[in-house]
């Protein structure tokens, strides 16, 4: 049949010669229809304007011509406009600034080219307060008080230096004493060391430290580049100009996409005191040791460049240091402008006013670092051209490094590799691999901005001249930046000002809310598993390797994956403070959830933190300064000639009707805290001699408090309190296991076994080793062999109590070792119970059970254990469960004469009944084997 079809086709082709073939363009196309969608990929169609004439039939146009075509249109993602919420209610009138405020939040950032939000998020109006302003001035004691409220040492008054910052210490002076015998210039760029740093935006902000303050000490440091020494400010612990920069320490990195350049900063990275949720901040590291140095505008430029075509990136960077510095750890002098901003903060918490501190002065300050510059360029290459060049990733980045050294850094001994000039990409540009890039993006830090910008270039433009690098390098000495720095939270500086503790706590609370504005959980899903990044009020998409487009909606021909990577949704609100003074919040991996083999979300799903709550009447925020013990206490005790003072409750108890004085004959009731119960007579009576008549009463624990588990572990079931006998289990993310016991039981006053602080998650080596084999075995190729107890059981596995029947000794072993020994047919080791061996009823029954097992006709493997005649294996727990004596089959060969309890008569039982009775912990003595 197939042969006849081929012959028919050949004959048909022969009949249709060139003169008879249909010229399809004889029938023109109609206009393209309008797109079915305005965005998010629609379709449009067009049809041929066919006329069924003689030409149409004679030339087989119906068979040869395409009558309709369709194409994709408006593939760009639909824009999302930024949307603001309504203003909330007016706040209470702040008694210190005499204003009230109302705020609103961004409900949705703009994305995919939507309209941005430009309206303010806060408004205020004057008001008449109903509370008193409780800000108190700091007592300077024997120090000099500046007009700004700052306290400085008395010896600094009238020394010819502006130590107050407002010059109030130099007024009305007679004779002035000098500190230094001659004048000294400040260290170049010393003000930069005192700038705040906005960790979330990745840029310096306002001055927080006054590095012009010298503290009345003439301390100087010399530089080899200057003849006169520089004056060292009081805030600096150490400064060193003798910094060596190697000629050839140029580093190169290759990136398939920009996602590795986007750094995920967690709580620890933010520093103690400013803990918040995990969120992504675009960071470009200035060197290996650098904490961070970011350029959000440069990052945005790189994202936009990558969206135009499928790209790879090569980054070239070199650090040039002028000096190193270290700040003091305490007694830092704040800048006058920062001090004034702190002093103007209200005592009553106001999110908008406190958040302005972070906008103006950043979130952190520099504790150490270097002044200098970073030569840092990001070269964008077409992924297709780079692939066609024939170079590997390692060869490509090496070629850029070599050409940079030769062209800009003037390194004398630079060997040019043959592959760098003769590959297909370099040959298009006269042997220059660098000019084969689409563009380079300047991430340069330090130096004059004009020189830094001139180091970048774009295809089609002239390559930067050789002197551009030397001009920039020379300008770094006069215009350095802070690089290779370490940070500390700005809240650490809020000390020795009025109400420092109150304001410090308010700032920490404000930061938690402020940081949420940078969390990309608010962004919509990016196409093709693009990574969303929140930049201001706009969401951007960082494209995966092999995707491009304004929103990563386009794919390279070789990108075939349909996997959707998971991304975190936003954190829930914090729960209320519970009885353990802890609160928690959660988030879900549903923005989107991983699909079709996509990556799971990285990071923790649940967070916990310490919390407090107040039982005092709210008369306004108290002013708490450093070194003050402000506690919730009652009024001072009043003198009384009759009645009883407040009695002392038992440990873990309190008095229901608590007060300072009680009348004669009055009773008080003793209650216990949550998790405890009162045992004894709970009432005390006040006697005429001002003593209390009270019986024995104590608060005994009935429940266990929720334990604090190390970070990374998940506790289940999650409850505030657990009853005695309840168990909890600790688990790790998929592929990891707990490096210690995972199951714990509430035993009254503590958890058994004790929960160690050193618990963590580690790679699940044993499961990987076991493969598809039975417990105690490992997979070698396609075969299953017994594990070696010595070589394969080095990682943690559950502790169990084991009896060696040869020596009659019992000891604690790992489950891995027991299973491996059983696989090797070691008959002398027997499972006793889960957990370490400890004297008690559990161990006693375990040993007796093993003795009885010698008479058992049933030996059923069950988890670590072997079940005998009087037991069955639980399918859910893989543990042996005792039968009831009535469930045992009567008769059999294994019979015993036993005496139960105080009965004088013997009774005949089989092995199942004997084991069941003993398992039920009933008193029994085996008189002899056989019938009575």
Swiss-Prot record:
Residues 22-79, 81-134, 565-612 form the TSP type-1 domain. Residues 611-688 are annotated as: CCP 1. Disulfide bonds join 22-61, 24-65, 35-73, 39-78, 82-117, 93-127, 96-133, 140-151, 146-164, 158-173, 180-218, 399-420, 499-623, 521-570, 523-539, 526-541, 543-552, 577-611, 589-601, 644-686, 672-699, 704-746, 732-761, 773-823, 784-801, 786-837, 793-816, 862-873, 867-919, 880-897, 882-932, 888-912. Residues 176-522 form the MACPF domain. It holds the Pfam family Kazal_C6. Residues 858-932 are annotated as: Factor I module (FIM) 2. Residues 642-701, 702-763 form the Sushi domain. Ca(2+) binds at residues 156, 159, 161, 163, 169-170. Residues 689-765 are annotated as: CCP 2. It is found in: Secreted; Target cell membrane. InterPro entries: C6_KAZAL (IPR048828), C8A_B_C6_EGF-like (IPR048831), FacI_MAC (IPR003884), Kazal_dom (IPR002350), LDL_receptor-like_sf (IPR036055), LDLR_class-A_CS (IPR023415), LDrepeatLR_classA_rpt (IPR002172), MAC_perforin (IPR001862). Membrane attack complex (MAC) assembly is inhibited by CD59, thereby protecting self-cells from damage during complement activation. MAC assembly is also inhibited by clusterin (CLU) chaperones that inhibit polymerization of C9. All cysteine residues are assumed to be cross-linked to one another. Individual modules containing an even number of conserved cysteine residues are supposed to have disulfide linkages only within the same module. Component of the membrane attack complex (MAC), composed of complement C5b, C6, C7, C8A, C8B, C8G and multiple copies of the pore-forming subunit C9. Component of the membrane attack complex (MAC), a multiprotein complex activated by the complement cascade, which inserts into a target cell membrane and forms a pore, leading to target cell membrane rupture and cell lysis. The MAC is initiated by proteolytic cleavage of C5 into complement C5b in response to the classical, alternative, lectin and GZMK complement pathways. The complement pathways consist in a cascade of proteins that leads to phagocytosis and breakdown of pathogens and signaling that strengthens the adaptive immune system. This is Complement component C6. It comes from Bos taurus. The lineage of its organism: Eukaryota, Metazoa, Chordata, Craniata, Vertebrata.
